[in-house]
């Protein structure tokens, strides 16, 4: 007989301390085996679409551990979000909704899906209206950066897939797009501390990984370069980069790294990139980054 677990979702789930803490709590509470889990959305009236990447990774983990789960009490706004970004059609019998230009559909990639991942990010993110203008070379280099961030998550996390989902918010006071990449694997904290033989906190290990040139990679693969390029784009664009891993949550905003305090532990890595839409800057590549073998 399966144990029934009721999970009540908060009123608003957004990419902030409370939102990431909720997912960390959720992973800790429900990723046991042989349960029947009901996700109750009756009080939840907002759920950032890009965070479906985290929920999807958690649900796949539940399935692997012989749990079954159901959704109930959906309010219209979260329901529409989950329907339009294809999340519901993956996890329920809902028919696939028409593709919506304001969503970056829920997707997961394997390590060997490099081409598929780059095509997906290019089409779903950079080819959409309102995105920052970039030269061909700059766009290629930024795509590599984003892919490097994803692949780092996979190879370092030693997990099977990286999960991705995104949402355009053209009607916000400051219109923006958010895209999240998630893997429930090893944490940045474990990787960096193993590499350095240290006992740094979650935040300090994320800051170490964000420092140009630092990498836990071995062999000839470059590390750190992609992140630097991505940080530059985010700073010029006035967007933000959030990284959550273990007990760490660091956010790059307005050229400053903000360290947040997490109550709960996330056993993997979440990376959320936010870019402002309608940016009047045009981006070109100032240095000759090796952009061969990208596409």
Mark where each language-model region is:
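Short, well-structured alpha-helical interface segments that form or flank functional binding sites
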Residues: 50, 137-144, 148, 176, ...
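Helix-loop-beta hinge of the Bergerat
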Residues: 104-134, 189, 196-214, 230-232
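Conserved ATP-binding N-box helix of the HATPase_c
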Residues: 58, 134-170, 228-234
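Flexible, glycine-/charge-rich segments associated with ATP-binding catalytic modules
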Residues: 1-31, 92, 97-98, 196-200, ...
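Amphipathic alpha-helical interaction surfaces in cytosolic regulatory modules
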Residues: 8-91
